[in-house]
Amino acid sequence: MARRKSRILAFQALYAWDAGMKDTDDLLSLQWASAEQLERIGEDGRAFARLIVSGTLSQIEQIDGAIKERLVNWEIERLNKVGLAVLRMSVYSLMFQKDIHPSIIIDEAVDISREYGDEQSYRFINGILGAVKTDLDKGILVVREGSAGQ
């Protein structure tokens, strides 16, 4: 549950970044979050949220490329910002956080999109993340190693 709250914090940060509301330093400071939210997740949770945000932003081109390649008759620019933030952080986790089981990453993404997205977004997110996982497993999607925020 603690990691879920950290993922929600990371999702909120990535949403704010995409909406142009915060720059990277502001996001990583987490000063924009409520004191209650920060207290609930503790220092380990804050570190995990920062890792997801910094890693996602450092690999944004590779992550967006992976998402774009799996969109059928759709453009990434047309995705709603909630869904895009959830997809970005989850694709980052699938590609770079190998210590976390993919089913946990996908389940958390679906739950967060159900809570914050529209009625249909969780199905779409589940499909895209399932395709990313499958393509990673088959070696179709190859991760370019580099600074992944780890």
Region roles according to the model:
Residues M1-Y122, N126-Q150:
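N-terminal interaction/assembly modules
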